[in-house]
Design a protein with these regions (language model features):
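Short, charge-patterned binding micro-sites
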Residues: 21-23
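Short, small-residue-biased leader/transition segments that mark boundaries at the very start
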Residues: 1-6
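A generic short alpha-helical patch detector that favors 3-5-residue windows
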Residues: 72-76, 100-101, 126-129
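Short pre-catalytic strand/loop immediately N-terminal to key active-site residues, enriched for Gly-Thr
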Residues: 13-14, 63-68, 120-125
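Internal alpha-helical scaffold of NAD(P)-dependent oxidoreductase catalytic cores
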Residues: 8-12, 28-65, 78-115, 160
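Short beta-strand segments
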Residues: 15-17, 32, 128
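NAD(P)-dependent Rossmann-like dehydrogenase/reductase catalytic/cofactor-binding core
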Residues: 103-166
Length: 166
């Protein structure tokens, strides 16, 4: 198993889980050095990884959860942007602009989470006016299990990752 190799004393290993936004220098890479990597060696690795995004050093035991929340999540976001675009096209926008609006909304929302330090739920609540359009959409997302679907999908991803590492 991968975990057995990771513990070999004769090997210096840094396990890395980047994601596809590395293609636009926006990767979020999990970095898991084994105990035989020096701080200087780790710093060299981080310089390379930070050249195409952000990094976070995490424990090896968290890899499966990291894969679900970061390694695989660009696919979930792409699906959401595609669905948002489809809905916008159905309401009259051309596809190119529909995707542009959807993608920019996702990008800006992500930046708000990262830069404000506010809880995502609090940020969501700031958009929802009483009896407004957004709260109606949020109610439908809850009715159709949006959050539950994401959680279940990530649990399945984590489970599959654990199975594949055996």
């Amino acid at each position: 198993a991968a975990s057995d190799v990771y513990k070999r004393q004769d090997l210096k290993i840094v396990r890395i889980m980047p994601n596809t936004p590395a293609l636009v220098k926006e990767s979020m890479s999990a970095v898991m050095p084994n105990e035989f990597i020096s701080k200087e060696e780790l710093d060299e690795v981080l310089v390379i990884l930070n050249s195409f995004g952000k990094t976070e050093v995490v424990s090896e035991k968290l890899i499966d959860g990291v894969i679900a929340v970061s390694g695989s999540s660009p696919a979930y976001v792409f699906m959401m942007i595609e669905a948002m675009g489809d809905a916008a096209v159905a309401s009259g926008l051309d596809r190119k602009r529909a995707y542009k609006f959807a993608a920019q909304a996702v990008l800006g929302s992500a930046k708000m989470v990262l830069e404000t330090g506010m809880h995502p739920g609090e940020l969501k609540d700031m958009v929802c006016s009483p009896k407004g359009t957004t709260i109606e959409a949020v109610k439908k997302l809850e009715e159709y299990g949006f959050r539950s679907a994401l959680i279940k999908a990530m649990e399945a991803c984590e489970k599959k990752s654990k199975e594949m590492s055996k």
